Structures are given as C-alpha cells and as structure tokens.
C-alpha cells in the first residue's frame, strides 16, 4: 500500500454498494426494503478522508450523495450485480453494505395489474452477489454486512462466520436490526465486526462505526 505525504492512500480503490434494491412487479409497483444508505455513505466519507479512490454503487437511498463521489445508480439486484461484476476486477476493497433483494418476480407484468382482483405471484431467488466477488478478484479485501432480526449475539456471530465460509468475506459487520435504535434508517447502530477476531461495538453513531470499521480494515490489509 502506497501512502502520500499526508498519510493518505495513493491509487487504492474502494467500491461500496449501498441502499436497497427494488424488484418491479409491474410498471408502478414492486418490492424493496428499508435500507437508507446511511451506513454506506458514512463508510464512503471515511474512505474519502483517508485518501482512497471511492466509487459508489447506489440503489434506493434516503441520503444525499456528495458530488465528490463517483456514483453509479442502479435499481434492481440484477443491475447491481452487473455493475459490481464490471468494476470488481480493478478494485482493492469492496464493502457490500447494500440490502439486495433476495427474491424477484418470475414474470414482470408490462401493464398495471388490476387492483380489484386477488393476486398470486411467483418469486425466484436473485443471484447472491457477494458469493461471486472472490471468483472475480481473489486478491480483493471483501467486507460483508449481515443483518439479522431478533436472534442472540451468538447466533448473529455464527451467521457472520457462515458468510465468511460461504462467500470468502475477509470481514463481516453483523447486527440485529430489531434492536431499539438500530433499525434500518436509524442514525445509530450496534455491531459486531467478525473474522477470526470479534470486535463488539456498542451503540454508536454510524459515523463512529464507520471510523472503527476502517481502522479494522487497515489493520487487516
């Protein structure tokens, strides 16, 4: 890793995915999630402050993205997958904060569906983007996020370690979004940073958490 005279990183590239994807059922309806993009944006700011070359792949977010960032806008899981696959080979770090839809509609209707009738829909799984990353770039430092709901600390950590096993992530940021003040869209969170070690971060602002995450990343790379 090369440093400039201020301690910043030269030519080191960070890719961050953020926000929630949207899967259309017809031209005006679809399914999405409550991801706000706040954590991804705080991580992007940390990367920028530390001198990295930052690119953001942005789905649906509730935050304003500063113009200093190179931004690629996407909507669906498929669009995000294509954008990531194109960029991953040239990146040094990928931080996957986006909440990507696990399912999409098998048949998207080209017209507005009649709301006066009962509706039965078929869903099929989307591609697990994070599981492709190490195949495309074995040398990349891969950071995953794992959001769980109403489970024990031990189970959250076990879930994070399972992602490491399945996707080859180098680091996983895990949390329980059912905790008070830690839900999607909140300004605070409580997380566990998991690899061979486990760093427990108590309830803190997402800005503070982003700073801690980057400190850990820089210890590992």
Give the predicted meaning of each segment.
Residues 6-221:
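A cross-family phosphate/adenosyl-ligand binding-site feature
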